[in-house]
């Protein structure tokens, strides 16, 4: 699929009039323009050709397209599961910047990650789980990464205030 096709999957725009209504022809120019605008808004200017196949993109660019797709259509929340896994340092940086940009637009993000530096860099709150259950909720400015890891491993027990959160 092209980048534009990927962004519009399940939300394709039809041509106006009889061609779209009866013959169900897609309005590709409108889809491409919208996709280009949304990628540009999020600073994904490294993607030159909107008709480029997604599988030819780098891992960071693919994640960027996925984030742009979620942000472009007024999602109430964006859920990202290990968005920086298997990415290089530069690509991870770019994905974290995209997360900040989307969050700045007022869209809540649920980030599932084992990469503690990334979590502490972008999170407002961190839900720590241990043995399949939520153990506590902490704010990154109040705790260190070492504290968070200690909670996860059971080396440290959170205070009652964090557990109740």
Where in this protein do the model-derived segments appear?
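Glycine-rich phosphate-binding loops of nucleotide-dependent enzymes
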Residues: 1-165
């Amino acid at each position: 699929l092209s980048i534009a096709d990927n962004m519009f999957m399940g939300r394709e725009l039809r041509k106006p009039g009889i061609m779209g209504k009866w013959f169900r022809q897609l309005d590709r120019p409108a889809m491409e323009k919208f996709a280009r605008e949304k990628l540009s808004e999020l600073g994904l200017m490294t993607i030159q050709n909107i008709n480029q196949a997604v599988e030819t993109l780098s891992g960071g660019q693919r994640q960027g397209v996925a984030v742009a797709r979620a942000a472009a259509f007024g999602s109430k929340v964006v859920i990202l599961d290990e968005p920086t896994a298997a990415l290089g340092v530069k690509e991870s940086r770019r994905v974290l910047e995209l997360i900040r940009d989307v969050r700045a637009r007022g869209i809540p993000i649920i980030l599932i990650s084992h990469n503690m530096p990334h979590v502490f860099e972008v999170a407002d709150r961190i839900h720590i789980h241990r043995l399949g259950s939520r153990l506590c909720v902490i704010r990154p400015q109040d705790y260190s990464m070492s504290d968070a890891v200690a909670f996860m491993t059971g080396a440290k027990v959170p205070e009652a205030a964090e557990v109740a959160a």
